[in-house]
Amino acid sequence: MKRVAILGSTGSIGVQALDVVGRFPDRFEVVGLAAGRNAPRLLEQIRRFRPRVVSVCDEAAARAVRAEAPPGTEVLSGDAGAVAVASHPDAAFVLAAISGGAGLRSTAAAIEAGKPVGLANKESMVLAGELLMARAAAKGVPILPVDSEHSAIHQSLVGHNRGEVRRLILTASGGPLRCTPEAELATVTPERALKHPNWSMGDKITIDSATLMNKGLEVIEARWLFGVEQQRIDIVVHPESVVHSMVEYVDGSIVAQLGISDMRGPISYAMGHPERMPLDLPPLDLGRLGKLTFEPPDPARFPAYTLAYRALELGGTAPAVLSGADEAAVAAFLARRCSFTGIAEVCADVLEAHVVEPVRSVEQALAASEHGRREAEKRVGARAHAPAGR
């Protein structure tokens, strides 16, 4: 029986992780849950899984949960609450799935507490990947990726000598706008950009998929998770989302992981590692699928992913600033205050204006991300009030 804590339990990944837990009640026990403000969903999870401790993002939500939670459930709030769940002494595994930079402190706390981490919060690696991997190595803590691409790379590295890796190849679906002409992208609506053809995800990551910023952030994540320089990490667009990523070795051989587009696959791989669990999911029928297609990404239409390579080149706080700027720009797009193409333009402006510093602490990384967010919000506001034709 593995005792688990799930951070971000009411989000897309958290809900699917609890679905996996529910399928294997003899393998997992939930000891802690951390959520945002969705008190009704958290209460449903509490009643079903009976965790010992839960946390929500603020005290108002905590009061609502305390009023209805079963006796014996400790209800905490804020960053301190999420950190307490992540470092709970009874947790033997922590699934880190809080979206955005908000998940960094709790992910770092799990590592410091010596907990194996299933990492679904890529922003933690983007903001402070070098720092977190150094602490994980010092603590002897395994970090198992939950992103489908990084899970695929992890699986494709098993049994191989990492010194023989030539490059990592991250696949991208291309998102809902892959075939949209460049001239139409500026007028794309949030509703259209949110219609992902293959994956069921939260709004922010779905927009990042549409801009290809998500793939750029995954390049940064892969840089630190696998210790491979960005010059040896490539992106290929693969619309079917069947090949989840690949590893090319020095002899030219390519090892890939294939599967259906269902996040419960990589979630169960991380949670059950080193064992695989028999999931009752539809099989991948390659004969019926017929073909797999691949194409290079188009930096002219989707320049956002190139900013991640630029951020790694700049180093230090640059990736954290880019991540914060992207969070603000995506939020502005969803609120109809920024155009679709404006997301990458705002992020590029913020990144190039940033004065880079080395990342020495989690708090410094968070401050850099917040700086990126503020600078992006300023630019969104300035663009909204710019004279027509400017």
Swiss-Prot record:
<feature type="binding site">
    <location>
        <position position="148"/>
    </location>
    <ligand>
        <name>1-deoxy-D-xylulose 5-phosphate</name>
    </ligand>
</feature>
<keyword id="KW-0479">Metal-binding</keyword>
<dbReference type="InterPro" id="IPR036291">
    <property type="entry name" value="NAD(P)-bd_dom_sf"/>
</dbReference>
<feature type="binding site">
    <location>
        <position position="173"/>
    </location>
    <ligand>
        <name>1-deoxy-D-xylulose 5-phosphate</name>
    </ligand>
</feature>
<protein>
    <recommendedName>
        <fullName>1-deoxy-D-xylulose 5-phosphate reductoisomerase</fullName>
        <ecNumber>1.1.1.267</ecNumber>
    </recommendedName>
</protein>
<feature type="binding site">
    <location>
        <position position="10"/>
    </location>
    <ligand>
        <name>NADPH</name>
    </ligand>
</feature>
<feature type="compositionally biased region" description="Basic and acidic residues">
    <location>
        <begin position="370"/>
        <end position="380"/>
    </location>
</feature>
<dbReference type="InterPro" id="IPR003821">
    <property type="entry name" value="DXP_reductoisomerase"/>
</dbReference>
<feature type="binding site">
    <location>
        <position position="214"/>
    </location>
    <ligand>
        <name>1-deoxy-D-xylulose 5-phosphate</name>
    </ligand>
</feature>
<dbReference type="InterPro" id="IPR036169">
    <property type="entry name" value="DXPR_C_sf"/>
</dbReference>
<dbReference type="GO" id="GO:0030145">
    <property type="term" value="F:manganese ion binding"/>
</dbReference>
<feature type="binding site">
    <location>
        <position position="38"/>
    </location>
    <ligand>
        <name>NADPH</name>
    </ligand>
</feature>
<comment type="function">
    <text>Catalyzes the NADPH-dependent rearrangement and reduction of 1-deoxy-D-xylulose-5-phosphate (DXP) to 2-C-methyl-D-erythritol 4-phosphate (MEP).</text>
</comment>
<feature type="binding site">
    <location>
        <position position="209"/>
    </location>
    <ligand>
        <name>1-deoxy-D-xylulose 5-phosphate</name>
    </ligand>
</feature>
<dbReference type="InterPro" id="IPR013512">
    <property type="entry name" value="DXP_reductoisomerase_N"/>
</dbReference>
<dbReference type="Pfam" id="PF02670">
    <property type="entry name" value="DXP_reductoisom"/>
</dbReference>
<feature type="binding site">
    <location>
        <position position="123"/>
    </location>
    <ligand>
        <name>NADPH</name>
    </ligand>
</feature>
<keyword id="KW-0521">NADP</keyword>
<feature type="binding site">
    <location>
        <position position="218"/>
    </location>
    <ligand>
        <name>1-deoxy-D-xylulose 5-phosphate</name>
    </ligand>
</feature>
<feature type="binding site">
    <location>
        <position position="202"/>
    </location>
    <ligand>
        <name>NADPH</name>
    </ligand>
</feature>
<feature type="binding site">
    <location>
        <position position="122"/>
    </location>
    <ligand>
        <name>1-deoxy-D-xylulose 5-phosphate</name>
    </ligand>
</feature>
<feature type="binding site">
    <location>
        <position position="149"/>
    </location>
    <ligand>
        <name>1-deoxy-D-xylulose 5-phosphate</name>
    </ligand>
</feature>
<feature type="binding site">
    <location>
        <position position="121"/>
    </location>
    <ligand>
        <name>NADPH</name>
    </ligand>
</feature>
<feature type="binding site">
    <location>
        <position position="37"/>
    </location>
    <ligand>
        <name>NADPH</name>
    </ligand>
</feature>
<feature type="binding site">
    <location>
        <position position="215"/>
    </location>
    <ligand>
        <name>1-deoxy-D-xylulose 5-phosphate</name>
    </ligand>
</feature>
<keyword id="KW-0464">Manganese</keyword>
<dbReference type="InterPro" id="IPR026877">
    <property type="entry name" value="DXPR_C"/>
</dbReference>
<keyword id="KW-0414">Isoprene biosynthesis</keyword>
<feature type="binding site">
    <location>
        <position position="11"/>
    </location>
    <ligand>
        <name>NADPH</name>
    </ligand>
</feature>
<dbReference type="Pfam" id="PF08436">
    <property type="entry name" value="DXP_redisom_C"/>
</dbReference>
<feature type="region of interest" description="Disordered">
    <location>
        <begin position="367"/>
        <end position="390"/>
    </location>
</feature>
<feature type="binding site">
    <location>
        <position position="196"/>
    </location>
    <ligand>
        <name>1-deoxy-D-xylulose 5-phosphate</name>
    </ligand>
</feature>
<feature type="binding site">
    <location>
        <position position="12"/>
    </location>
    <ligand>
        <name>NADPH</name>
    </ligand>
</feature>
<feature type="binding site">
    <location>
        <position position="147"/>
    </location>
    <ligand>
        <name>Mn(2+)</name>
    </ligand>
</feature>
<feature type="binding site">
    <location>
        <position position="149"/>
    </location>
    <ligand>
        <name>Mn(2+)</name>
    </ligand>
</feature>
<dbReference type="InterPro" id="IPR013644">
    <property type="entry name" value="DXP_reductoisomerase_C"/>
</dbReference>
<dbReference type="GO" id="GO:0030604">
    <property type="term" value="F:1-deoxy-D-xylulose-5-phosphate reductoisomerase activity"/>
</dbReference>
<comment type="pathway">
    <text>Isoprenoid biosynthesis; isopentenyl diphosphate biosynthesis via DXP pathway; isopentenyl diphosphate from 1-deoxy-D-xylulose 5-phosphate: step 1/6.</text>
</comment>
<dbReference type="Pfam" id="PF13288">
    <property type="entry name" value="DXPR_C"/>
</dbReference>
<dbReference type="GO" id="GO:0070402">
    <property type="term" value="F:NADPH binding"/>
</dbReference>
<feature type="binding site">
    <location>
        <position position="36"/>
    </location>
    <ligand>
        <name>NADPH</name>
    </ligand>
</feature>
<dbReference type="GO" id="GO:0051484">
    <property type="term" value="P:isopentenyl diphosphate biosynthetic process, methylerythritol 4-phosphate pathway involved in terpenoid biosynthetic process"/>
</dbReference>
